[in-house]
């Protein structure tokens, strides 16, 4: 492993339990260093054996975040992009599965020249290469290690960052460990023992944390902080609260107020001006003064785990702040919705159908689309949401018999949605149309008025598309196709709109992946504005 790098490395690990907010902590560190003028990048190392999360259930894993270059990645990369504005790539997320996939290809090629291939050094060398690659011009590289210290899957990654810490020395590496300090209601007391045990687990693999972030409802007392410092060999000034917040965009300011960025720079002996956090303060000031509320109904089948829609929720929040309104989301399980359950839409200001897979819950989504179309309620369909809007229109307006998607019925009479021919293969993983692609907009369309440009670039993740054989027929009945992948007549359809409706748009791409709190996505801004107009017109 070469130690020729001018970048400094920040490793973020987690202990006690998962879902403490390592990704948000890493993103906040990146935002704070960026606010001081440093160049940063963020990377995620996931210990699961899948090559990527593309085939994992959203109920288990949460959303799959798609990068511009078409990588299906962990949702934390979405936090990285939204907090820092730095675009992530396929080279910023690695899994155990990807490491072993590359390792075995190298072994089969004979790259190891007859060696016995082992976890150390061969697996750890590949992980080290991932961490250290493409760091030219970067002041800081922030690496989040997925999972929890003590998990068997995490051991090769922890060994790798231990090696890097040893090779590059304390002057170029820092270990930040996030733990849980639970509050026991019955005893009315914070408990530090889980943190002590977590640090002990980390020390057992040769890593001494330099900073401890503790997730808690309230800050520790000085006595409790000193106790952790003494037992964990960490300076009391480096034991920093990761307090619960109402809005995740409070985190950078909260961490700064507790000197997280100051202590990191002190560790590296780096001087810098104070961070400019005015844009974060502005977002919070706006969000704290909102009075009017719009209610968006989201109809999906993964609502048991809202992380399945993480980027979508954030994009709607960004657009709501931009429009100076509070956002209220009414989550509706598509599998429990039928034509008799339309009272679920009472007092909603708009309806949104997000992306998804499979026929489970499709009838409920169709019911929602019909309700939005007939009652002139603002409607946004994303990916499958657009496809189902076409299916609903073909059946109920164009009166095509048995119009459907071949995803749900391979032998339907009128397949208005069918599989992309070039994607018809046996493998499920990595077999979709992925990443950023251009989309050409009709100059006379609502979508053009929203974007104010004729060519846009958006990220895609789909296997099915509109069947162009039905284009003329559906246009005759009032459906317009206002965005396409290129300027040819046989181009893939990317955007649909409905005539005689105030705001009814379907998009094949995923606009939620390109929204941030400081650059709200124009499509969501327009959608929330239409929701507000609908509310005011009631």
Swiss-Prot record:
CTP binds at residues 18, 151-153, 191-196, 227. One of its GO terms (molecular function) is identical protein binding. The lineage of its organism: Bacteria, Pseudomonadati, Pseudomonadota, Alphaproteobacteria, Rickettsiales. Pfam families: CTP_synth_N, GATase. PANTHER family: CTP SYNTHASE (PTHR11550), CTP SYNTHASE-RELATED (PTHR11550:SF0). It comes from Ehrlichia canis (strain Jake). UTP binds at residues 18, 191-196, 227. Pathway: Pyrimidine metabolism; CTP biosynthesis via de novo pathway; CTP from UDP: step 2/2. It catalyses: UTP + L-glutamine + ATP + H2O = CTP + L-glutamate + ADP + phosphate + 2 H(+); L-glutamine + H2O = L-glutamate + NH4(+); UTP + NH4(+) + ATP = CTP + ADP + phosphate + 2 H(+). This is CTP synthase. The gene is pyrG. Allosterically activated by GTP, when glutamine is the substrate; GTP has no effect on the reaction when ammonia is the substrate. The allosteric effector GTP functions by stabilizing the protein conformation that binds the tetrahedral intermediate(s) formed during glutamine hydrolysis. Inhibited by the product CTP, via allosteric rather than competitive inhibition. ATP binds at residues 19-24, 76. Mg(2+) binds at residues 76, 144. Keywords: ATP-binding, Glutamine amidotransferase, Ligase, Magnesium, Metal-binding, Nucleotide-binding, Pyrimidine biosynthesis. Residues 1-270 are annotated as: Amidoligase domain. Catalyzes the ATP-dependent amination of UTP to CTP with either L-glutamine or ammonia as the source of nitrogen. Regulates intracellular CTP levels through interactions with the four ribonucleotide triphosphates. CTPSs have evolved a hybrid strategy for distinguishing between UTP and CTP. The overlapping regions of the product feedback inhibitory and substrate sites recognize a common feature in both compounds, the triphosphate moiety. To differentiate isosteric substrate and product pyrimidine rings, an additional pocket far from the expected kinase/ligase catalytic site, specifically recognizes the cytosine and ribose portions of the product inhibitor. The keyword Iron does not apply. Its EC number is 6.3.4.2. GO terms for cellular component: cytosol.
């Amino acid at each position: 492993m070469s130690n020729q790098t001018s970048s400094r490395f920040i490793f973020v690990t987690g202990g006690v339990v998962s879902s403490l907010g390592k990704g948000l902590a890493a993103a906040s560190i990146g935002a704070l260093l960026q606010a001081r003028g440093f160049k940063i990048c963020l990377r995620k190392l996931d210990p699961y054996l899948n090559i990527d999360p593309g085939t994992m259930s959203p109920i288990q894993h949460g959303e799959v975040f798609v990068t511009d270059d078409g990588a299906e990645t962990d949702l934390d990369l979405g936090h990285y992009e939204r907090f820092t504005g730095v675009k992530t790539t396929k080279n910023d997320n690695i899994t155990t599965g990807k490491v072993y996939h590359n390792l075995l290809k190298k072994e089969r090629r004979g790259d190891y020249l007859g060696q016995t291939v082992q976890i150390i050094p061969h697996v750890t060398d590949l992980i080290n290469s991932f961490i250290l690659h493409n760091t030219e011009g970067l002041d800081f590289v922030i690496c989040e290690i997925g999972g929890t210290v003590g998990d068997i899957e995490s051991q090769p990654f922890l060994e790798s960052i231990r090696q890097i810490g040893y090779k590059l020395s304390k002057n170029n590496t820092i270990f930040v460990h996030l733990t849980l300090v639970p509050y026991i209601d019955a005893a009315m007391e914070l408990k530090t023992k889980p943190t002590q045990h977590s640090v002990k687990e980390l020390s057992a693999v040769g890593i001494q944390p330099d900073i401890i972030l503790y997730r808690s409802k309230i800050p520790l007392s000085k006595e409790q902080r000193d106790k952790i410092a003494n037992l964990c060999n960490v300076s009391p000034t480096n034991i920093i609260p990761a307090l619960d917040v109402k809005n995740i965009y409070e985190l950078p300011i909260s961490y700064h107020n507790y000197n997280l960025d100051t202590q990191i720079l002190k560790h590296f002996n780096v001087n810098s001006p104070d961070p400019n956090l005015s844009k974060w303060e502005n977002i919070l000031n706006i969000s704290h003064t909102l009075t009017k509320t719009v209610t968006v109904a989201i109809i999906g089948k993964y609502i048991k785990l809202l992380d399945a829609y993480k980027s979508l929720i954030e994009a709607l929040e960004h657009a709501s702040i931009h429009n100076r309104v509070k956002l209220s989301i009414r989550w509706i399980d598509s599998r429990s919705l039928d034509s008799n359950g339309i009272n679920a839409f009472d007092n909603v200001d708009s309806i949104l159908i997000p992306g998804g897979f499979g026929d489970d819950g499709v009838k409920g989504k169709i019911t929602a689309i019909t309700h939005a179309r007939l009652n002139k309620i603002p409607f946004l369909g994303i990916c499958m949401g657009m496809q189902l809007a076409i299916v609903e229109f073909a059946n109920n307006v164009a009166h095509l018999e048995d119009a459907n998607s071949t995803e749900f019925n391979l032998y339907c009479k009128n397949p208005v949605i069918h599989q992309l021919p070039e994607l018809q293969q046996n493998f499920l993983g990595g077999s979709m149309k992925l990443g950023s692609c251009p989309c050409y907009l009709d100059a006379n369309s609502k979508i053009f008025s929203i974007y104010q440009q004729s060519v846009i670039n958006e990220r895609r993740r789909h296997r099915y598309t509109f069947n162009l054989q039905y284009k003329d027929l559906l246009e005759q009945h009032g459906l317009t196709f206002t965005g396409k992948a290129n300027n040819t007549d046989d181009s893939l359809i990317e955007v649909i709109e409905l005539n005689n409706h105030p705001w009814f748009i379907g998009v094949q791409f995923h606009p939620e992946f390109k929204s941030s709190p400081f650059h709200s996505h124009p499509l969501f801004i327009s959608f929330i504005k239409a929701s507000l107009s609908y509310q005011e017109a009631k």
